[in-house]
Amino acid sequence: MLLHIPEVLNGQELATLRETLAGADWQDGAATAGAQAVRVKQNLQLPAGAPDARPMGELVKAALLRHPLFQSAALPHTVLTPRFNRYEGGGHYGNHVDSAIHADPFLGVSVRTDVSTTVFLNDPEDYDGGELIVEDTYGVHEVKLPAGDAILYPATSLHRVESVTRGTRLASFLWTQSRVRDDARRGMLFQLDMTILSLRGKLADAPEVVALTGHYHNLLRQWADA
């Protein structure tokens, strides 16, 4: 499931992040890439040890966790502290699949990466290129969203970032271990949840709505890891 989540970050949060990142000490993104990805990764990344890395990551994480669409679609068990990257001057990231396990230096845990999320920090007009391309069983999807919006997709997806030929592309990225590891099951639960919310707006707590809600929770109970 690939999902556009609008308005994750508000204007003040975006301004704070952009101002802090403008003075950041970036490093070569290849330093954090795996054996396959290092050959195709040409970007800059904020080191985990940077002074503002954790507070900025926590700001993005809190914004996602308060967004109902993220909660419904990701069903988060553990959200890794968000990181930050920068593309400019031809920077790009070729086709790759994210590593199955990632460690969080701040939380002191390693998690299974079920869901990948990118939060865009500047507007599409600020740069040329830089599209996130996600390939799945339904085809090839090109993503370039307004500042503050996020895209959520399965971490199993083959994906890339096209070359940035003008300007600078800033983004935050993160992984989530979901309570439901299978993407198809997460997608079904998400659609059922959205249907229940729509029906509740029309029928309030009619018996049919209560019954569907019960089915949702019984499926979640059956499929959830914990």
From Swiss-Prot:
Origin: domain of life: Bacteria
Pfam families: 2OG-FeII_Oxy_3, PKHD_C
Record key words, sorted: Dioxygenase, Iron, Metal-binding, Oxidoreductase, Vitamin C
GO MF entries: 2-oxoglutarate-dependent dioxygenase activity; iron ion binding; L-ascorbic acid binding
Keyword Metal-binding on entry: yes
Cofactor(s), names only, from the UniProt record: Fe(2+); L-ascorbate
GO BP, sorted A to Z: DNA damage response; intracellular iron ion homeostasis
Matches recorded under InterPro entries: Oxoglu/Fe-dep_dioxygenase_dom (IPR005123), PKHD_C (IPR041097), PKHD_hydroxylase (IPR023550), Pro_4_hyd_alph (IPR006620), Pro_4_hyd_alph_FE2OG_OXY (IPR044862)
Cofactor remark: Binds 1 Fe(2+) ion per subunit.
Cited SMART domains: P4Hc (SM00702)
Residues reported in the UniProt entry to bind 2-oxoglutarate: R169
EC number per UniProt: 1.14.11.-
Amino acids binding Fe cation: H96, D98, H159
Class of the enzyme per the UniProt entry, highest EC level: oxidoreductase
Domain Fe2OG dioxygenase as annotated: residue spans: 78-178
Xref: PANTHER family: PKHD-TYPE HYDROXYLASE YBIX (PTHR41536:SF1)
Protein name as catalogued: PKHD-type hydroxylase HNE_2117
Organism, as annotated: Hyphomonas neptunium (strain ATCC 15444)
Taxon lineage: Bacteria, Pseudomonadati, Pseudomonadota, Alphaproteobacteria, Hyphomonadales
